[in-house]
Amino acid sequence: MKHRQAFRTSCIAVGAALVVQGTAAAAQDLPVWDTYTYENQVAAMQELIASFKAEHPDVNVNETVRSLDDLSLTLRLAVQAGNGPKVSQVNQGAKDMGTMAKSGLLVPLDDYAEEYGWGAGQSAGLIDRGRWSESGQFGEGPNYGISSLGEIVGLFYNEQILKDAGVTLPIADFEGFLDALQKVKDAGVAPIAMGTAEGNLPLHLYASIFETNISAEDRAPFDDLIYGRGGSWTTEANVKAAKYLQDWAEEGYLLDGYSGISANDAVQLFTAGQAAFLTGGTWYFGDVQNNPDIHFMPFPAPAEVEHPLSVGGVDPGWTITSIASTKEEQDLGASFIQHMVSPETAVVWAKHGYLPATALPEDADVELSGLLKEGISIWDELNADNAIGHYIDWSSPTMLDTVGDNIPLLLAGRQTPEEFAAALDADYQAYLQSQ
């Protein structure tokens, strides 16, 4: 789950109406909403829509770009009102895709997935994150969305700051990370870039501490928790993760003034060398890649965990909404989605510094940034180990708000780790009972 405050609308004329002897051949309109607000993402989308133009000269793509928060607030209501997009990205969790699928606001994509062979470019484990059953079961039933980008939440680090502080690289495990935090603090540098005024950096840090305690071989209970099959957020690992987060705030490991800093500003401060570490996602590659000292690694796990999970998965899935009410409109929407997840599009995303969910062609002619090389290597290893974890806010429609309301209390010492875990669990159990 990523956030960037932005709202941008553009109408890209994918072909123009042809006027022949005074008669206009009307172009098809394809309203599209997406969340690609970062500068390099905008550039990639402009290139991709331009290439769609070459294939579909009779289509007008009306693109609206929103932050994920804005999309979540407006999309369902817009589609219900009949004035939303025909194609849109939708966050895969219960709050958004689950609710819209259950309400009949999304079109199943299984026939198109078979027609276009989407399963050849993305693993079943990734595609299953767009599935919702008629009974509201996450990860099962029809597929409603497929993604352009893979996402890993890992640990960005400034190599020069760590060397200056006497930290030995690579950091082997969680104990080594704890040692590095103290050495950086002793050197007079903020160990962790953090901002809680807007965005989800503390959520991703909490989830990373928690999920790296889970080995891929033992992930079934966590999968059940996220997919709404039952479980608890009050386990020892959940409480310990909250305790670490609170301790780091109390010990001054977080960027000074973090409560008044947004996630985006924290990323910029990290890029400028104001902190040693940033726990964030691969969607930040384009933002931080201009600093050659910055590298990316999986979040360090306890030494005894053989194949630790990493928070992540895929970016919001491309969907066809019920606004596309005819077969012709749905076919057009599917052709646009195919364009967004094709191997050729994977090359475009890689060229702009992002991690594509669809595998790059073996003969792809693209020069990868150092960060992206690191990201792809980690992505391939995590996929091979079945160790791509989850975004914890997918577990209920209100979990993102619950985490966002309670983490500031935890960091400020106004809530114990046990109370924090209990708040998450109360949200989750209420959701299970409502099903």
Region spans (language model):
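Short, solvent-exposed loop/beta-turn-alpha elements that line the ligand-binding surface or hinge
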Residues: 110-125, 212-240, 301-310, 370, ...
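Extracytoplasmic/periplasmic substrate-binding proteins
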Residues: 35, 95, 204-205, 209-214, ...
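Extracytoplasmic/periplasmic solute-binding protein
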Residues: 134-148, 153, 178-230, 275
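Extracytoplasmic/periplasmic substrate-recognition and gating elements
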Residues: 50, 54, 81, 165, ...
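Hinge/lid segment of periplasmic solute-binding proteins
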Residues: 94-152, 205, 296-298
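C-terminal capping/gating helix-and-loop segments adjacent to ligand/active sites or protein-protein/ligand interfaces
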Residues: 355-362, 375-429
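Conserved N-terminal structural module of periplasmic/extracytoplasmic solute-binding proteins
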Residues: 15, 25-105, 114-121, 169, ...
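Glycine-centered hinge/linker elements that transmit conformational signals in sensory
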Residues: 181-183, 223-258
